[in-house]
């Protein structure tokens, strides 16, 4: 439907959990794409927008990249002005569930003196069909149903627990040095252990209230009945789709256990 039209696409991606899957959507589109990295307010202020744009430039050829926080109204006006400048009469707004699509649309409505009444939710399928939203005589948004990723943690975690794990405020990274045969446990969801001969430095970017427990891994059976994934990485990010990510500093030989290994992906280091 979208490719059959000549309308441009505003594609929203959650900055925290950028992945190959989320960026592969761009390859399926023949339209002009404005790539919008959302939820900027969750990352530390020390992370510059220019750094995020540089990171994206190494992953996609898209030149129109915007970094926004709809909640804080950072970058939204800039994007709106660009759409008007380019004479975009009508654009599709697309994105995965929890990408911040509805919050973004509500902010544009309010900027144009209208009530922001689009339903926002962290759960899939809030929008069931395409909705035309006229901002003004110059621009109409076509709100589309959110994509539901088969790799999202949402698919494997109890709904009420999942909602409690979603970050709502600036994330304070938690740094751990893990010795060989030690591990970090994230609730009943995730276990990561160091099999390297050297110490491993891991930086966790998750909701601040999430408790991380460090303990010995030898003879510890916690989560060992779950899906297992072994990785050897160097200066990479390990993403838990929809929840956050772990930055691996230097080389690491790691074993992970989680509810479903689809939840885990590895990407080039973002920060």
Model-derived segments and spans:
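Helix-rich effector regions associated with P-loop NTPase G domains
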Residues: 1-9, 13-25, 30-34, 40, ...
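Conserved long hydrophobic alpha-helices within structured protein cores
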Residues: 101-102, 143
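Canonical P-loop GTPase G-domain recognition
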Residues: 42-99, 105-121
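Short amphipathic alpha-helical patches
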Residues: 103, 107, 168-171
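A structural signal for isolated positions on well-ordered beta-strands in alpha/beta enzyme cores
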Residues: 10, 34-35, 66, 92
């Amino acid at each position: 439907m979208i490719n059959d039209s000549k309308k441009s696409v505003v594609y929203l991606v959650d900055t925290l959990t950028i992945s190959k899957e989320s960026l592969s959507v761009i390859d399926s589109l023949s339209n002009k794409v404005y790539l919008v990295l959302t939820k900027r307010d969750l990352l530390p202020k020390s992370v510059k927008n220019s750094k995020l744009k540089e990171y994206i430039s190494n992953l996609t050829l898209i030149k129109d990249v915007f970094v926004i926080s709809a909640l804080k109204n950072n970058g939204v006006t800039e994007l709106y002005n660009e759409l008007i400048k380019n004479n975009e009469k009508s654009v599709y707004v697309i994105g995965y569930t929890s990408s911040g699509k509805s919050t973004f649309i509500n902010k544009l409505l309010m900027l144009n003196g209208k009530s922001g009444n689009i339903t926002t939710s962290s759960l899939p399928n809030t929008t069931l069909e395409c909705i035309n939203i006229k901002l003004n005589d110059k621009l109409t948004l076509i709100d589309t149903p959110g994509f539901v990723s088969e790799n999202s943690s949402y698919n494997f975690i109890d709904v009420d627990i999942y909602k409690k794990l979603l970050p709502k405020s600036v994330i304070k990274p938690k740094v751990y040095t893990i010795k060989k045969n030690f591990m970090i446990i994230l609730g009943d969801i995730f276990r990561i252990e160091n099999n390297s001969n050297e110490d491993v430095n891991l930086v966790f970017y998750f909701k601040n209230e999430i408790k991380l427990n460090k303990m010995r891994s030898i003879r510890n059976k916690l989560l060992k009945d779950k899906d297992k994934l072994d990785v050897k990485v160097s200066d990479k990010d390990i993403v838990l789709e929809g929840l956050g990510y772990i930055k691996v500093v230097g080389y690491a030989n790691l074993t992970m256990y989680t509810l479903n290994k689809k939840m885990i992906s590895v990407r080039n280091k973002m920060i």
